Amino acid sequence: MLTSSGERKANEDFLDVLISSDRQDFILCDGLGGHGNGDVASRFVTETIKEALKKEMSVEESIMEAQKKLLEKQKAEHAENSMKTTVTCLELSGSKAKFAHVGDSRIYHFEKAKYVQRSQDHSVPQMLVNRGDIKEKDIRHHEDRSRLLRV
């Protein structure tokens, strides 16, 4: 897994791996630093997903469980406008791969000597691409490239 602080001073990413005899789960959360407590959110969501996966919940169920618990934590700590994170979770089992994500932390597949993006960002520019308003090549430099629709 690759993480980078980008233009920010601190990297608020948190990642973990869960390995069992029949599968491997990889969890990556990228805390939103501009909202405060992104590091808290990324650690909390990663740990919550890991615990849910240990209970044999699916990747999707684990993310929903983490979202529910993060919302409860935000409310309890009066932090509804902070403690935000993206999440990407990949499960490998035999020759099968499943993933789920929220935000703009991407999943790529290395295929035929090149990387192929498998996930689609939950961002304003991606929405504009989907509507046909801009081209995919314009996402990288779009003024709203960091504006997410889901976190």
Predicted regions located by residue number:
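PP2C/PPM-type serine/threonine phosphatase catalytic domain
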Residues: M1-V151
